[in-house]
Amino acid sequence: MRKILMFLIACVAVSFTASATPSWEINSKGAIQWNVDKAQLPHKDHVEMSGELMAFVLRWAINADGVLDLDRSLVFPMLRTIPNDTHASLMHRLNTDITSMVSVEEKSLYNEATKFVEIDGMFRVVSIFDEAVEVERIIFPSMDKPFMCERYVLKNLQDDEVKVYIPEFKQNITTLPECGVDGSYLISASIQGAGTYKLKSGESLTFDAVFQACRLTEAPQVADVDAEYAARRAFVENDIDSALILATPDQVVNTMFRYAKIRASESIFKTSGGYMHAPGGESYYAAIWANDQAEYVNPFFPYLGYAVGNESAMNSFRHFARFMNDEWKPIPSSIIAEGKDIWNGAGDRGDAAMIAYGASRYALAMGDKTVAKELWPLIEWCLEYCDRKLNDGGVVTSDTDELENRFPSGEANLCTSSLYYDALLSSAYLASELAMNPSVAKDYRKKAETLRRNIDSYFAKEMYEYDTYQYYDGNDLLRSWICIPLTVGIMDRAEGTIEALFSEYLWHKDGLLTQQGTSTYWDRSTLYGLRGVYAAGASDLATEKLKYYSHRRLLEDHVPYAIEAWPEGSQRHLSAESGLYCRVLTEGLFGIRPTGLRSFELKPSLPSEWDAISLYNIKAFGSDFSLNVTRREGGKLEITVTPAGGAVKKYLIRNGQSLKVNL
């Protein structure tokens, strides 16, 4: 059998290297910046940002002359359209050119030369007009109002005084009454800060453009853009930057992790059905899914400790719990329209396994017995549902999987059974924490042991000389989801699986192909794959691919977040994928696996090129603590656990060894 070490060498033939001159760089503030005079033009890209009451996708382009163009796709998830289905958020695109309406010394402020673009929870562009005036744009969503804000700062670069004319401007669009759940909606754009100004040399003035929507029976609001800007900065600096801080020797990985925290946390909407985390992408709002929310992002929020994130996680589980039933009908895949309707168009996708997996991990990581008790009935129901879906081979059947028939998944797929396996183990830990009869935990562990054997006997298969898995019975093409067993601790075929994942059949310049022989990729499987390879102990290979992927997503042609897929959706910045990126580090590199409300297993996988890694201000397990992993002599790792206000604990283990940590 080929060894991982030899495989690393062979990987060179199918690896991809990042550009020697990246379009973007990380500036002194820790933000990503693209200096236009260093880049090849023209260039275009798109980025999504969200607040509680609106989101937008900003499509921006810089032409061959260095001139910026902005196209705003506005989304208002709580202004519902007809039919009131998954995609029924009010949406409208506006290409209004604000600066062209401004005059400087009687000349239209038009065709500025763009100097640089910066993204850091906001979109910032600095340009120069006529070598006389610097124009700074700062674009961001309101955190709690239906506003997209654009702040413009004009600075006089000349020695002489200049006159600046900011016009009064208002643009109103009224939608058709028959198209809205609440009748007509009003979409408006306006300028705040109109007037005629004189700027001496070096002086600046600020004005704002605000894009918003409301019901026709309501009046547009006057935005306090100073307050909105401060609130957005507070979200980034206080909620995101003050917790779960990653420190590795690689600046790109550290920065990508920070950006992933932003995107994973911002896409939460305050609906009539409570806070709902939503994927986004101009399609999926005011709704939840068993995979995106329950499985992907909810288990991440306890580590960050973001209160709105945790509230959205609990709200999603409460919504799913509404559909438990005595007839053992499947829980819907998605609860849509602010909780008022469901979507189950793909049938049973293994949703109960997704929910059990996510809810049990979430309950343990939260470290709150009240939360655990509330979630237990849902977890228990989902486990029983999965048990009732076992086929003659002892694995879980479903109609499809999370890809919803985009690719075949057979009667039973590897993903669903692997998630059920992990949920059984988590639930055994949880049952013990809740002081249930010891037979409950014992029964779940016994079922997990049996399922693990069945997964191997049913799915294990030599595929193209790799000792790995078929995704479903009869599957004869390699699939990216063969990585799933690695993420749940099933290492029986780790070596062959890792070789297959990074072979010429599956590894692509944008990550893992969904299926051998296609050009389709979904970031979710790449991110699961990276986590699984770390869990398997192949830290050098995992780090090589993580660094490549992070550079690709953060600093190259489409930035700055993990994406959904290609070609479907044009690489939308769906939010939960950023949660999966963070979990590559927390659960993969650091190897954190919840085992109790105040305990976890730690199995760091430190690559040979790094001597130390740290994770500061972890909010999980009802605590606030930091982890430091440092290489010592003899191949040992020193683990330092530092609780906030508590006694420091130090351990010495071998690289790849597990450690039980009690807080």
What are these regions (language model features)?
Residues 198-225, 282-286, 332-354, 384-449, ...:
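The feature captures the catalytic groove of carbohydrate-active enzymes
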Residues 324, 366, 383-386, 390, ...:
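Alpha-helical junction/boundary sensor with strong preference for TPR arrays
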Residues 237-373, 400-404, 472-488, 502, ...:
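Substrate-binding groove/exosite segments of carbohydrate-active enzymes
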Residues 268-271, 324-329, 387-397, 457-464, ...:
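Proline-centered turn/helix-capping motifs that create local helix->coil transitions or kinks
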Residues 1-21:
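Bacterial Sec-dependent N-terminal signal peptides
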Residues 257, 261-264, 441-459, 549:
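Short amphipathic alpha-helical coiled-coil/interface segments
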